[in-house]
């Protein structure tokens, strides 16, 4: 689990001080999804810049230049590839023809090794599963909604992607990992992995208006935010999206289908409904909450675990492994 965050301000409504404040607020709020590393990509002139470090977001200094209109950010919880080796961290640089881009990923890919062999991708010292998406795009030779869709359609596992090119085109690719987007009347668009993160970040930015609308994306949607603020929507083939899902993608509960799931659903209380809503808003799966309930965790235990994602998924893992031994 990692955090995606960022914004597009095509009409230059934010002065430099507010740009930095918004960037820092989004990054710090996204820490709940990863503290191993943090990074952003932005465009200065027509030069793509990437600033990332193996540090939690609150320890970073976000020195974003004036006149920056797009920020694409990431907070990392390490699953593959040591975060101390900075090339393993997001966003990743890439190049398609004459176009440079940066890519960030939230999720876990299962078929990265298979894709490397199938498409004869070059060896690299970057050890993360995410980087295969960069290599596939580079092999296509151009960067647009079609080639991004082709790459997304080949991925198996869990993901949402964000991609920024040197011309300030920002692509938000919605797979089966969470992504929440708000649009303001000024044309400003802000996004984060979950609604709770986005609300927390924006609450720290009193200079932003309260009036906004949700931009809804479904699995398979690709939203391109152009430099002039126009939105272009396209789709990718989702037939591989839920192929060979593992317990940490689809929810361990579905893997085991215990009978008490129906019991819990029939006997939900107001407090449990609230817990489930909170979990979903934070990017957790309802089925994993039910699994922990069946294992004997009470609602207060689970509520505490939601604030410690590593401990939450650790509890899920222990439960699944124990059942595999039964």
What are these regions (language model features)?
Residues 1-326:
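Conserved short alpha-helical segments that host acidic/polar catalytic motifs at enzyme active sites
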